[in-house]
């Protein structure tokens, strides 16, 4: 089995917000290495159930091995948390006591060259969470027009140099396909004027983020998964979501606020006709972030933001 390493971010804070109860049914929609799931399983005890979902077969296998001691209390499923509603239906589960989504790419995926996520390691430009299906990042770079590439890099990477990078990609691929991570990283670094290179951020960071989001349809998955998760929660059940960049965090914040809002009728209406009731109580007015001790131990935790909410009756 492929060795899988990953440090669970905000583990203590997640447990405080999720507050798992003995005998409850919980779902970890982004299983990863199984660190968060292990903590939940320890709390819910032998009468509880934790369902772990992941698109990555390597993550699923590693977590299943790590959590084997919990026996039938742990149920691993390969799939995307965006398909959460269908996966729960297949398993015959109607309601949940709690749900966790950790939206970050795992340390293992970033540090494994053949996965193609890292601009620091040379490997095939893949970036698929599930390598058995879908187009790779290299496919996108080869097939998309300059305009489409600009839109992807600008929208998903919030990159100010998106147009220039997209044009350079199209010019380069006419001579040679862009198929490796370092090939793309060098291209982006050479396109952005050196005086605009940031000290602590590699110049290709935003472009790689944008391609990864596009390849895996991450933002669509986030919205679908959160909406389905809220619908599946019991009254008093909780949802906790860890995001790692502003695009994800904005979606989480918006969906939580939307679900926590009641009547949306105009003030001039004499009575409510929308019949909208608040579904959630937001538990985190501001996102919870990692403290200095955790960020010293795991620098990738610096950008993590945790938001949580509780389902109303």
Swiss-Prot record:
Gene Ontology BP terms: rRNA base methylation
Signal peptide: none
Record-listed S-adenosyl-L-methionine binding positions: 34-36, 54, 81, 102, 109
Known catalytic reactions: cytidine(1402) in 16S rRNA + S-adenosyl-L-methionine = N(4)-methylcytidine(1402) in 16S rRNA + S-adenosyl-L-homocysteine + H(+)
Coiled-coil intervals, chain numbering: none
GO molecular function, one term: rRNA (cytosine-N4-)-methyltransferase activity
Pfam families: Methyltransf_5
Chain segments carrying region Disordered: 289-313
Documented EC number(s): 2.1.1.199
Keyword rRNA processing: yes
Localisation per UniProt entry: Cytoplasm
Transferase among keywords: yes
Cellular component annotations (GO), alphabetically ordered: cytoplasm
Keywords attached to this entry: Cytoplasm, Methyltransferase, rRNA processing, S-adenosyl-L-methionine, Transferase
Similarity remark: Belongs to the methyltransferase superfamily. RsmH family.
Function: Specifically methylates the N4 position of cytidine in position 1402 (C1402) of 16S rRNA.
Protein name (Swiss-Prot/TrEMBL): Ribosomal RNA small subunit methyltransferase H
Organism, scientific name: Trichlorobacter lovleyi (strain ATCC BAA-1151 / DSM 17278 / SZ) (Geobacter lovleyi)
Gene symbol of the encoding locus: rsmH
